[in-house]
Amino acid sequence: MDKLVVNGGNPLFGSVEIGGAKNAAVAILPAAIMASEGISVIDNIPDIQDIQRLERIITSLGCKVKRVQNTVEIDSTNLTSVNADTEDGSKMRASYYLIGALLGRFGKAKVELPGGCPIGVRPIDQHIKGFEALGATVKISHGTVEAQADKLIGTNIYFDVVSVGATINLMLASVFAEGTTVLENAAKEPHIVDVANFLNSMGANIKGAGTDVIRIAGVEKLKGCNYSVIPDQIEAATYMIATAACGGCVTIKNVIPKHLESISAKLIEMGADIKEGDDYVTIESHKNLKGVNIKTLPYPGFPTDAQQPMSTLLSISQGRSIVNESIWESRLKHVDELKKMGANIKVEGTVAIIDGVEKLTGANVKATDLRAGAAMVIAALAAEGVSEISCIEHIDRGYPHIEDKFKELGANIRREKI
């Protein structure tokens, strides 16, 4: 196991290249196995643990998978197995996309109940409701989900709550369904649009992605295609927030600025300077930022995945800030770690009341989940003194080469074996 050792206090300067969106890539790889002809060549795939696990799972199903740097080739023409009941699947949330993909292509699927970050109850009831509405029978037993259908028939599906995962999974399952499927109260995140665009590039007929009503007209088959995944808005947000916390000036390259509007708006409100280009964002910060209130919401609102990094920044900003985590009820576990470094934060349910302190002090802390890990890296970079961050396997699930990228910006950070 590894840990990160950070000697904080350095401002950040330079530029950083953002990789492909984790949340898009972990759905696009399962989508690729739905092609019965041709090879999919997918560019801008991040080199992170969740992707490596998915590559192993779909290889075990009979696909041929080849990675060259950030490009992954998938040949699913000889895929025969529908049993994705693997240990890798139990360690990541996105393994559930294999249910929709396999059910859509073969009419049956067997997948290990998904794992991922311990940030609260993450039920798949909306997924199951949708699969059953299409005509599938779904059973959950001994940690495994099994779905089966003689034929999937398009229908209208209304999500009781806005769910990114259910929206994507039902898009996958509906691609081959007879007739038209309408998803109402659908999530609108950029990676949902990206998955729909990928499926359409393979021959699907999906309209309305990015709105709250998505229509999928069933097609007979999909063919492999060439595609490039959108940039990762949360990775970009992490480097923006880190620059604001440490001070300095950093250009974040290979981004879609529109996807970062909710982040940029809050950082500007706090006092940071932000300039946007077609595919970059430059942030300049002299620290001494003022606190703000945030509430996490589905896109285009403030993203829950950026809440924990932003909480770190607010802990060293002037005045009081209120953070309302409205998406996941257990996504404030990082607060106890920030307190070890001197943060003044009180948690009431899913609300954090943050009174900014002048500085944080280095300490031994742990990454309790993926985005909490990013929050602790930012805290350590901004703190006075040395910090050690353990449990960084969570960080590796979503941030490629995080220590190398921060080193390039002038941070004193290194990875060590425990």
UniProtKB/Swiss-Prot annotation:
For the ligand (UDP-N-acetyl-alpha-D-glucosamine), the binding residues are 93, 122-126, 305, 327
Uppermost EC category? transferase
Q: Which Pfam families match?
A: EPSP_synthase (PF00275)
The processes (GO biological process) annotated in the record are: cell division; cell wall organization; peptidoglycan biosynthetic process; regulation of cell shape; UDP-N-acetylgalactosamine biosynthetic process
Tell me the residue numbers annotated for binding phosphoenolpyruvate: 22-23
- Keywords per UniProt: Cell cycle, Cell division, Cell shape, Cell wall biogenesis/degradation, Cytoplasm, Peptidoglycan synthesis, Pyruvate, Transferase
Q: Domain of life here? A: Bacteria
Give the record's pathway.
Cell wall biogenesis; peptidoglycan biosynthesis
The GO terms this record gives for MF are: UDP-N-acetylglucosamine 1-carboxyvinyltransferase activity
Q: What residues make up the catalytic site? A: 117
Where, per the database record, does this protein carry 2-(S-cysteinyl)pyruvic acid O-phosphothioketal?
117
User: Where does this one sit in the cell?
Assistant: Cytoplasm
One GO cellular component term noted in the UniProt record for this chain = cytoplasm
Q: What EC number(s) has UniProt assigned to this enzyme?
A: 2.5.1.7
Catalytic activity field: phosphoenolpyruvate + UDP-N-acetyl-alpha-D-glucosamine = UDP-N-acetyl-3-O-(1-carboxyvinyl)-alpha-D-glucosamine + phosphate
Check the record and name the InterPro entries matching this protein.
Answer: Enolpyruvate_Tfrase_dom (IPR001986), Enolpyruvate_Tfrase_sf (IPR036968), MurA_subfamily (IPR050068), RNA3'P_cycl/enolpyr_Trfase_a/b (IPR013792), UDP_GlcNAc_COvinyl_MurA (IPR005750)
Function, as annotated = Cell wall formation. Adds enolpyruvyl to UDP-N-acetylglucosamine.
- Mind telling me which PANTHER family this protein's record contains? UDP-N-ACETYLGLUCOSAMINE 1-CARBOXYVINYLTRANSFERASE, UDP-N-ACETYLGLUCOSAMINE 1-CARBOXYVINYLTRANSFERASE 2
According to its UniProt record, which protein family does this protein belong to?
Answer: Belongs to the EPSP synthase family. MurA subfamily.
What name does this protein carry?
UDP-N-acetylglucosamine 1-carboxyvinyltransferase 2
Q: Which organism is it from?
A: Clostridium acetobutylicum (strain ATCC 824 / DSM 792 / JCM 1419 / IAM 19013 / LMG 5710 / NBRC 13948 / NRRL B-527 / VKM B-1787 / 2291 / W)
Organism ancestry: Bacteria, Bacillati, Bacillota, Clostridia, Eubacteriales
From the UniProt record, report the name of the gene that encodes this protein: murA2
